[in-house]
């Protein structure tokens, strides 16, 4: 595995920290767009990159939040035009946890 690929993945320790920090889907906790999914989609919890891996988003705590499969798909697919709104909420959430949180600092640099 090359250095960049490794830097963009959440390792087991980081995944655990994110899961422990968020206690489930950050969007379900605020009741965000809860009407269009099955119970199965709400129960499957993923770690979501805030800055996408395809954009060089690092696999670090400050670049990950938990989301159920439904909300993860909403954010990744952007089919309903909610990505910008979802990222704004995540920005506020992360800023409350990490002083000076800045998504521009979450990108891989050589």
Show the residue positions of the predicted features:
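Short cysteine-rich loop/turn motifs with clustered Cys
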Residues: 9-46, 68-70
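Short basic/aromatic active-site micro-motif
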Residues: 47-52
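Polybasic, low-complexity binding patches
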Residues: 2, 6, 36-39, 54-65, ...
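Basic side chains
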Residues: 3-4, 15, 21, 53
